[in-house]
Amino acid sequence: AFCNLRMCQLSCRSLGLLGKCIGDKCECVKH
């Protein structure tokens, strides 16, 4: 598995968060 940054950002944006790839994981962080 690998992190797709664009998909990560989109899914996090719907939560009002910023998407970042950490290794192969998507992390949602506050702006």
From Swiss-Prot:
It comes from the Eukaryota. The record marks 1-2, 7, 24 as: Interacts with KCa2.2/KCNN2 and KCa2.3/KCNN3. The keyword Disulfide bond applies. Expressed by the venom gland. Two disulfide bonds are the minimal requirement needed to produce a nativelike and bio-active conformation in this toxin. The third disulfide provides an additional contribution to structure stabilization and can modulate biological potency depending on its position and the structural regions involved in biological activity. Disulfide bonds join 3-21, 8-26, 12-28. InterPro entries: Scorpion_toxin-like_sf, Scorpion_toxinS_K_inh. GO terms for molecular function: ion channel inhibitor activity; potassium channel regulator activity; toxin activity. GO terms for cellular component: extracellular region. Pfam families: Toxin_2. Its main location: secreted. The keyword Transferase does not apply. It is found in: Secreted. Residues 6-9 are annotated as: [R/K]XCQ motif. Keywords: Amidation, Calcium-activated potassium channel impairing toxin, Disulfide bond, Ion channel impairing toxin, Neurotoxin, Potassium channel impairing toxin, Secreted, Toxin. The modification Histidine amide is found at residue 31. Blocker for the small conductance calcium-activated potassium channels. Shows the best affinity for KCa2.2/KCNN2 (Kd=0.2 nM), followed by KCa2.3/KCNN3 (Kd=1.1 nM) and KCa2.1/KCNN1 (Kd=325 nM). A mutant [R7diaminobutanoic acid] has been developed that discriminates KCa2.2/KCNN2 (Kd=3.8 nM) from KCa2.3/KCNN3 (Kd=2500 nM). Has the structural arrangement of an alpha-helix connected to a beta-sheet by disulfide bonds (CSalpha/beta). Belongs to the short scorpion toxin superfamily. Potassium channel inhibitor family. Alpha-KTx 05 subfamily. This is Potassium channel toxin alpha-KTx 5.1.
